[in-house]
Regions:
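Short, charged/polar surface micro-motifs in flexible loops or helix N-caps
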Residues: 31-34, 43-48, 64-67, 111-115
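Conserved short histidine dyad/triad with adjacent acidic residue
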Residues: 24-26, 38-54, 89
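Short beta-strand His + acidic residue motifs that chelate non-heme Fe in jelly-roll/DSBH
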Residues: 49-51, 69-70, 87, 93-100
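A generic "binding-loop/recognition-motif" signal
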Residues: 47, 55-56, 75, 91-92, ...
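A short hydrophobic beta-strand segment most commonly corresponding to one strand
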Residues: 41, 59, 86, 101-116
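Short acidic-glycine-tyrosine-enriched beta hairpin
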Residues: 73-89
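A short, N-terminal "cap"/entry segment at the start of jelly-roll beta-barrel domains
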Residues: 1-35, 50, 116-117
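Glycine- and acidic-residue-biased ligand/ion/polar-headgroup-sensing regions
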Residues: 55-67
């Protein structure tokens, strides 16, 4: 078993994100998890991620606050604490914190090809 204490979690930069800080909780350099990695993202008010899609699916779990997910189809969904969603590979989405409080969420993703530990 490998434990990552929050005080030991390492920061990483997520491309196309703004006014947000991320910590690696599992996978990559945080642990030997071989099937997925887990990040903790803290979005400041007004923070978010640009509309983008990726080659891998991802799961979001909101821990605190609210996160608005805008899809390229025009759909908008507001996720609250303990709400979760699955974004399929190739599905474009934007994320934003439209509130005046910090929003925190877990991100769970498989490794890109040849990137597993």
């Amino acid at each position: 078993m490998q434990i990552t204490r929050i005080d030991d979690a390492q920061r990483y930069d997520a491309p196309k994100h703004f006014d947000m800080r991320s910590l690696r909780l599992q996978g990559f350099s945080a642990s030997k998890a071989d099937f997925a990695w887990v990040g903790l993202s803290h979005f400041l008010p007004g923070g978010g991620a640009e509309m983008d899609s990726g080659p891998l699916g991802k799961i979001y779990v909101v821990l605190e606050g609210e996160v608005t997910v805008d899809l390229a189809t025009g759909e908008t969904h507001v996720l609250h604490a303990l709400d979760s969603c699955f974004i399929a590979a190739g599905e474009a989405r934007a994320i934003r914190n439209a509130s005046n409080a910090v929003a925190s969420m877990l991100v769970v993703m498989p490794y890109p090809p040849k990137a597993s530990p």
